[in-house]
Amino acid sequence: MAELSLAELREIMRQSLGEDEVPDLADADTVTFEDLGLDSLAVLETVNHIERTYGVKLPEEELAEIRTPHSMLIFVNERLRAAV
């Protein structure tokens, strides 16, 4: 079973930001995507990358409630476990 790690999410977010710097996710459970400089388009690019890489569909209506990298990680991994 594939699982998305915090390091993998961090790299995907870096690619979505289009920057060389990797976002600091030391406080991944409290820092928001907005705090990290990810606008809605960058978050959507992150989601699309995860869907392509992990072969899982992430419902947009549920994603709208996710504000932090930690919640994204939990959400994605729950979907990955359910897909098995």
UniProtKB/Swiss-Prot annotation:
Signal peptide range: none
Gene3D superfamilies registered for this protein in UniProt: ACP-like
In-chain residues carrying the UniProt-annotated modification O-(pantetheine 4'-phosphoryl)serine: S40
GO BP: any one term: daunorubicin biosynthetic process
Phosphoprotein listed as a keyword: yes
Pathway of action: Antibiotic biosynthesis; daunorubicin biosynthesis; Antibiotic biosynthesis; carminomycin biosynthesis; Antibiotic biosynthesis; rhodomycin biosynthesis; Antibiotic biosynthesis; aclacinomycin biosynthesis
Biological role: Involved in the biosynthesis of aklanonate which is an important precursor common to the formation of the clinically significant anthracyclines such as carminomycin, daunorubicin (daunomycin), rhodomycin, aclacinomycin T (aklavin) and aclacinomycin A (aclarubicin). These compounds are aromatic polyketide antibiotics that exhibit high cytotoxicity and are widely applied in the chemotherapy of a variety of cancers.
Name of the protein in its database record: Anthracycline acyl carrier protein DauA
Record organism: Streptomyces sp. (strain C5)
High-level lineage: Bacteria, Bacillati, Actinomycetota, Actinomycetes, Kitasatosporales
Gene name per UniProt: dauA
